[in-house]
Swiss-Prot record:
Catalytic function, reaction form: uridine(54) in tRNA = pseudouridine(54) in tRNA; uridine(55) in tRNA = pseudouridine(55) in tRNA
Gene: pus10
BP-aspect Gene Ontology terms: tRNA pseudouridine synthesis
Protein's recorded name: tRNA pseudouridine synthase Pus10
Gene3D superfamilies: 3.30.70.2510, 3.30.70.3190
Length: 427
């Protein structure tokens, strides 16, 4: 249908403002606002029909009920809602009153257009408010994961400002044993610290099995510096509570909810964390990251290197140890869920590869064993056999009982590519 005929039918329904008129043909001619399209149509229609040009005040429009005059007002209200928040990107969404949606559907019908012709009122409102907000705050629109997100409810005359999480990536070393990665609630009282009216005997009333954690040494510092409401620790797997995490450290991301600050000095933040942890934990390589880095550390396949101090139940000679280790190297191990974790892991048999294995005797009853293995390989059970649940094992190959007395993780690296990818970091 000819656009002037569309305009004639639309304006014949009553007072229609330029924006609502132009929205009917929003897919025609780029570089114009809908108000400019509508004004051009109204002018062309007057010229075609040789009639007086009669502009329509937006406040009198029966379609939007004057809402198209409010773009500036809502942009200013949005800016006020986040005036004490640091952000670089934003997005705007709108809930229009049902009557306006009904009005614009009726206008399309009267103009002889399909239901999906042109552009919805909601889309224009989002864009026009967003453009003005961007100019006011000197920030950029984002349709992916903006720093701040607004929902305008026109019927309720309300604006909701959501400040999305920010993320800090790094690697940590755990330099003391008996520190879990994250808080470990007591199984007996389920973290309440109580058994009925009395303090829980199992955890001493604290609600936790351990006093400290890597999370507690790191996340509160980041939350405080970024002035957030809560911080969550995401690790690339986790070492045993009694194991050290040394070498290159383990990748992690700390997510801070509703941060008021995003542009922080990561070198200073790193120093603050290390000072707070006081030698129990240390972090390095802190960088501002995107949400994608959370998925990366949680899902990326990782290989691990371990150093284990091993005690044998009987004397072992160097040749026998070397032969057993050589047989382990390059093999695929079958591990049924270990006894020590079967209360919290599914009872299945897992296959894991041993990439490299070396060992050196300290004396006939003690050795240092180093293993490079696939992620998810249970090292303690690879040494002990776990009552036959792991095959093959060092103990089984030697025919001698073996136990890990101290375990260190010395490297956590991506299987096929590094954890760190530049597109997952922010400036």
């Amino acid at each position: 249908m000819d656009v002037l005929e569309v305009a004639a039918r639309a304006t014949g329904t009553g007072p229609v403002c330029d924006a609502c008129l132009g929205r009917l043909v929003a897919d025609r001619s780029f570089g114009l606002s809908n108000a400019e399209r509508g004004s051009a149509l109204r002018t062309s229609l007057a010229l075609r029909d040789d009639e007086d040009y009669e502009p329509v005040e937006t406040a009198d429009c029966w379609v939007c009920e004057g809402r198209c005059t409010e773009f500036d007002e809502w942009a200013e209200r949005a800016a006020e809602a986040v005036e004490d928040v640091e952000f670089a990107t934003y997005n705007v969404g709108t809930r229009p009153p049902p009557l306006i949606e009904e009005n614009e559907a009726l206008l399309r019908e009267e103009a002889g257009l399909d239901d999906d012709a042109g552009e919805p009122f909601k889309s224009e409102f989002n864009r026009e408010v967003g453009k003005r907000f961007g100019r006011l705050t000197e920030t950029e629109v984002s349709f992916d994961r903006p720093d701040v997100q607004f929902t305008i409810d026109l019927a309720e005359d309300e604006i909701d400002a959501k400040v999305n999480s920010t993320f800090v990536y790094g690697r940590y070393r755990k330099l003391e044993r008996d520190i879990p990665q994250t808080e470990w609630p007591c199984r007996e009282c389920k973290g309440s610290g109580r058994q009925g009216a009395d303090p829980c005997d199992h955890c001493g009333g604290s609600g936790y099995l351990y006093d400290d954690s890597v999370e507690e040494y790191t996340a509160p510092v980041v939350e405080d510096v970024m002035d957030g409401t809560e911080a969550t620790f995401h690790g690339a797997g986790r070492e045993d509570v009694d194991a050290l995490m040394l070498g290159t450290g383990r990748p992690f991301v700390i997510e801070v909810e509703e941060p008021r600050r995003r542009r922080v000095d990561t070198d200073r933040l790193q120093a603050d964390i290390n000072a707070f942890a006081d030698g129990a934990v240390e972090v390095e390589g802190l960088r501002l990251a995107t949400y994608d880095m959370v998925e990366r550390v949680k899902e990326h396949d990782a290989a691990k290197r371990y150093r284990a101090e091993v005690a044998f139940d009987a004397d072992v000679d160097a040749d026998a140890l070397a032969a057993a280790v050589e047989e382990l190297e390059g093999t695929t191990v079958e591990q049924y869920t270990p006894n020590r974790v079967d209360h919290r892991r599914a009872s299945i048999t897992r296959e894991r590869d041993v990439y490299e294995a070396t060992a050196e005797l300290d004396d006939a009853r003690h050795a240092i064993v180093e293993i490079h293995g696939e992620g998810g390989l249970y090292i303690k059970e690879l040494i002990s056999g776990d009552e036959g649940r792991t095959e093959p094992s060092l103990a089984g190959l030697l025919g001698v009982g073996a136990e890990v007395t101290a375990l260190d993780v010395v490297a956590v690296e991506g299987e096929d590519e590094p954890f760190e990818r530049e597109e997952f970091f922010r400036e």
